[in-house]
Amino acid sequence: MLMLVSANDVGVGIAEHISGTEVEFAKLMTKRAKELGANNTNFVNSHGYHDENHYTTARDLMLITLAGLKSEDFVRVWEALEYTVPATNKVSRTTKIKNIHKMLCEDLSQYYEYALGGKTGFHDDAGRCAITTAKKDGRTLLCVTMKSNKANQYKDGEKLFEYCFKYR
């Protein structure tokens, strides 16, 4: 759910389950980022909401994402268009969750036919951000856009992909 619809409460739950507190989990995230070479990143929460001490770069997001894409489980979620949460002993019905990354949704105007998967994010200070993978003519690219506005969030990524696919 966290990757498909930015369910920030799920991020907090994951952090508390793994590390006891969100602060401790953020320390683990920062440590792992540094191990991946993402040296201009510091996490202070598990969901990305603004904090002066919570920061990253497009390059660092690329490095972190490339590491994730080495995992089959990560790729399965990264490329998922939807997920059905099964019924439990607490909730008797299933719940369908759809990916909110519009470049992946065929019925939307922002759809990009070569997009494989991705993650979006937004808050007032960061603007609209997206990390997206696309494949065309056997070539796979990863694009990170940051600080976009609503009108250009997906156009920015598409323009970058098209430029890179054209000028190998």
Describe these PLM feature segments.
Residues 1-4, 26-27:
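Signal peptide-directed extracytoplasmic domains
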Residues 20-168:
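Penicillin-recognizing serine hydrolase domain
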Residues 4-17, 44:
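Substrate-binding clefts and substrate-entry loops adjacent to catalytic sites
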